Amino acid sequence: FPTRRSSDLGARNFQAVFWNVAYYDKYYFNSLFEHFVFPDGSKPDWGSLSWLQKRFMKWFNEERTRTVLTFPVETMALLTKDGDVLDKEYGDFTAEMYAEGHSFFTYMSDNADSLSSCCRLRNEIQDNGFSYTLGAGGVSTGSKSVLTINLNRCIQHAVKSGILYPFFLEEVVDLVHKVQLAYNENLKLLQAKGMLPLFDAGYINMSRQYLTIGVNGLVEAAQFMGIDINDNPKYEAFVQEILGMIEKYNKKYRTKEVLFNCEMIPAENVGVKHAKWDKEAGFQTYRECYNSYFYIVEDKSLNIVDKFRLHGHRYIEHLTGGSALHMNLEEHLSKEQYRQLLRVAATEGCNYFTFNIPNTVCNKCHHIDKRYLHECPECHSENVDYLTRVIGYMKRISNFSQARQKEADLRYYAPVR
């Protein structure tokens, strides 16, 4: 099934179906399904689910050594308390799977009010106005529209025009919300005309779909303002100011029927387009593809803990649509090292992350190795390609767009010492 679902389909312009799998620890499972009852009166059984989760994860990890499988994107959901995971068994199992070379995301929360899937996508189950936009775990939420603000261009335009950038940015944010509301009215009109059959059939609930305000160019905007891109008070204040403003307007325009969230978008294509358009317009761009993280992907000065900190609670608290940390490493760590990094993530409040170690694919004999190698260990050919994450999902670097291939070549993969 995963193999077939990862195949290209003509109905999606020859792209694979984007789908997700969520795993739960015992406490997460109990919080979500403790009072759930099936129509026949039976209840979900943790023991059988835990067995199935572990079996599927082990099998899928092995399957990825046989063929290139982009999907599903997997997420391990862990509840945390006092700087560590509550379920020590699943904390150890998560570290074990990372050490065995498996590629998946981990989502951490101190309460089971949310689920995550994909690269930076979360559902909040409680009605508190926070949600990633793809949906997971049977909670029928998602995004019906994403409008992205190019922060670098907005701030540079304001400064060059002699305007205080917070005033100009506030105008842009307000306008984007009004455009989203207009789009929402158009959707309602289409549904009234019977043109949205999936909504009518109940597969998608209009009132639970979010209007997403995307952000891109945050790092580049900070660089333009002369701010160092590392964990420092000036950068923290800048991030809080920008994202806090968007969250304020999300709350202002929110109603019982209209929900907003803010997301640092993956920007697989638009990160390249923004940089290209800005360069042509005479703005400083700093790189050919704008970052989708709170750090510069090519920066060699930041260590692993620095990056967890930059994606920790002090920086992401206003990102109600989320942002994932991609921890790029040259090689896999030990189970004990990964287990310690789970504690670091819990302590720093980095709630969504993955470890990204390029997998080697031989173009001659098609052998797949979970390690980052320059020669095939089977046939010793140097004609190799690499599987890594373009954004949230894994694919061959040779299948990236040309601009993304250049960006991938610049990424810094931290050596393990």
Residue ranges and their predicted role:
Residues 220-228:
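Well-ordered alpha-helical scaffold segments within catalytic/enzyme domains
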Residues 101, 214-217, 321-323, 356, ...:
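Glycine-centered flexibility motif
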Residues 3, 151, 156, 208, ...:
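Generic structural "secondary-structure junction" signal
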Residues 363, 378-417:
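Long, charge-rich boundary regions
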Residues 1-207, 228, 232-377, 381-386:
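Conserved catalytic cores of very large enzyme subunits
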Residues 200-221:
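Core structural elements
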